[in-house]
């Protein structure tokens, strides 16, 4: 079902990163009511730029580390709900690409995403009288087919795809729909700085960047298109400036 972002309230976790900031710029052009950015490090210049793009949109920043205990996330969301009354869309975008940091990669890329999602269900779940909502989780094409030199990162992104697909199937129960946007190799600082697991390929970043990539802006534009298409359960591939829905192959069925 197509979705208009006009006059909506969007919470964007990691909305000041490479792809995140470009996506935030595209979002404010859609005449949101509120864009609430949750990120580890405040960037006043970026916030000012977002406000200047469209002064009609209220842009707010809260410091947030996705690795905090879930109770802290719930407390922060309670503050935001008290301020806005409603949240229409949650974008989970926190991510690191550093297979030297195994525990942190899992904590940021997967556990933090699960905890943030779980926390907002306290407010959205229709079984608790909530209004429902929309969750957009940022995965990666490595969630489909791993970059085998970064198996920890790739594994977390595969987990994001499966978790989100499960959320989508639970929508009739919770009232919360979900989908993933999965960028291909995009020219950001994240790609330039990452390390391979156990240094199995010291030049993994250079080798990846030798192949065709996409600019962050092209990825961001398709990101917002995916939000507007609003297809529950969709697995979007955002690669080389294109937007494509992936058809996931079923190899097993739980039968329940």
From Swiss-Prot:
MF-aspect GO terms: alcohol dehydrogenase (NAD+) activity; aldehyde dehydrogenase (NAD+) activity; protein homodimerization activity
Organism: Drosophila yakuba (Fruit fly)
Pfam families assigned to the protein according to its UniProt record, in alphabetical order: adh_short (PF00106)
SUPFAM superfamilies linked: NAD(P)-binding Rossmann-fold domains
Active site: 153
Complex and partners: Homodimer.
Oxidoreductase listed as a keyword: yes
Catalytic reaction list: a primary alcohol + NAD(+) = an aldehyde + NADH + H(+); a secondary alcohol + NAD(+) = a ketone + NADH + H(+)
Keyword field: NAD, Oxidoreductase
Annotated residues for binding of NAD(+): 12-35
Lineage top rank: taxon: Eukaryota
Protein name: Alcohol dehydrogenase
Segments crossing the lipid bilayer: none
Organism classification: Eukaryota, Metazoa, Ecdysozoa, Arthropoda, Hexapoda
GO biological process: acetaldehyde metabolic process; acetyl-CoA biosynthetic process from ethanol; alcohol catabolic process; behavioral response to ethanol; NADH metabolic process
